[in-house]
Amino acid sequence: MELNLINALVAIVITVLAILLDLVLGDPSPNYPDKWVFKLHPTVLMGKFTKNIEPFFKNADAKMEKFLGILLGLTVIVTFTSPIFIGLWAIYTFIPFCINLVVYGFISVILVKMTICIKLETDWAKAAAKAIDESNLPEVKKYSHFSRRESKDLNGVQMGSAVIESMSENLIDFKLSPMMSFAIFGVTGAIAFRAINTLDGMVGFKTKEHINTGWFSANLDNFVNFIPTRLTSLRL
């Protein structure tokens, strides 16, 4: 009973510290893709890995390609969660109690922080809102990372709509869902969610290129976001 209480308290502390760390440090901006902090961010690594291996899961037969799409998704998820699970298990198992809590907690805070995005997105939203208010459309389009829409032909009002739409979606993808995944499945769960969400962003499209290899990733993302989406809709 006492151990469960300690674990619950540790999880709460990790969540709070991860949020505070994000609010202080934020995330590396996509506007500077050559910086090493951007290149080594887990989401960026997941995206590049997915892009590089997807061609190996292509097949002329649609059914086979859908099956390979399952393998693609599982490959990415397992590749990024296995080292985390094994590493944290080793820390928890082989390092003496109390010391292992500190080490586990420190690493967990950093990893959970990397699955959420609050400061960077908030800064973007404020900057985009200011640019829209000033009718500075070129400046607004610098923040087109916000939306999956093609920003080239959007006017100020449409860009504003895109920002609001993306803020609502990212409330789920970069805040509520990763934190819920951590609360239920631990650090590995949060990393797994980030991998699933990244897969959806890379291949989860109904285009000729991705409709088969990405169907599993898209549906898996819908599944893991089912409850967070409903909770968010109640809040909004």
Where would I find each of the regions flagged by the language model?
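Substrate/ligand-engaging "lid" and interaction regions
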Residues: 197
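Hydrophobic alpha-helical transmembrane segments
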Residues: 1-191, 204-236
